[in-house]
């Protein structure tokens, strides 16, 4: 009889991947990133363990969306106080904080529990082409 092998925390191997977001569609890129963060691309994937890898995203300000989403897509946040709803369009958020666009898209594709929060911490998004993770020797992710 075959036994299912559950990887232990010592045997899980974590790699670093680099993704260039220049001229990539937001949703298509976010699904690939979420897959790697969860570890679903590995044969050792286990739903209740964090088996995923680290992902570095550069050129976040050059991400693209199709159609009229650039002028019509809205991002909402709430301060928690009465009347504290703030709404911002994709264009203005891309000028101000382009990292948040990719972070929000990926976060919505991860589990909405403590495991998803743990996996989200392995995502590093940067506005320009430079990143401080050269020592980790990130491998370019084919996307």
Curated annotation (Swiss-Prot):
Q: Which UniProt keywords apply?
A: Ribonucleoprotein, Ribosomal protein
Q: Which GO terms describe its molecular function?
A: mRNA binding; structural constituent of ribosome
Superkingdom assignment: Bacteria
Q: Which CDD domains match?
A: Ribosomal_L13 (cd00392)
- GO biological processes: negative regulation of translation; translation
Task: Extract the PROSITE patterns matched here.
Answer: RIBOSOMAL_L13
Keyword Transcription regulation (UniProt): no
InterPro entries hit by this protein: Ribosomal_uL13, Ribosomal_uL13_bac-type, Ribosomal_uL13_CS, Ribosomal_uL13_sf
Supply one GO CC term from the record: cytosolic large ribosomal subunit
Does the record bear Ribonucleoprotein in its keywords?
A: yes
The UniProt function text for this chain reads: This protein is one of the early assembly proteins of the 50S ribosomal subunit, although it is not seen to bind rRNA by itself. It is important during the early stages of 50S assembly.
Which family, according to the similarity comment?
Belongs to the universal ribosomal protein uL13 family.
Subunit: Part of the 50S ribosomal subunit.
What protein name applies here? Large ribosomal subunit protein uL13
Tell me which species this is from: Prochlorococcus marinus (strain MIT 9312)
The encoding gene: rplM
């Amino acid at each position: 009889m075959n036994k299912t092998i559950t990887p232990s925390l010592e045997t899980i191997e974590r790699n670093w991947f680099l993704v260039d977001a220049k001229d990539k569609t937001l949703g298509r890129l976010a699904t690939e990133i979420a897959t790697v963060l969860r570890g679903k691309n590995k044969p050792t994937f286990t739903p209740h363990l964090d088996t995923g890898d680290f992902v570095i995203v550069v050129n976040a300000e050059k991400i693209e969306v199709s159609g009229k989403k650039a002028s019509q897509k809205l991002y909402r946040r709430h301060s928690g106080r009465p009347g504290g709803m703030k709404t911002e369009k994709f264009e203005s958020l891309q000028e101000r904080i382009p990292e948040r666009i990719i972070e929000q898209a990926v976060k919505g594709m991860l589990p909405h529990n403590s495991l998803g929060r743990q996996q989200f911490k392995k995502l590093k998004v940067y506005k320009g082409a430079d990143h401080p993770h050269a020592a980790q020797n990130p491998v370019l992710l084919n996307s």
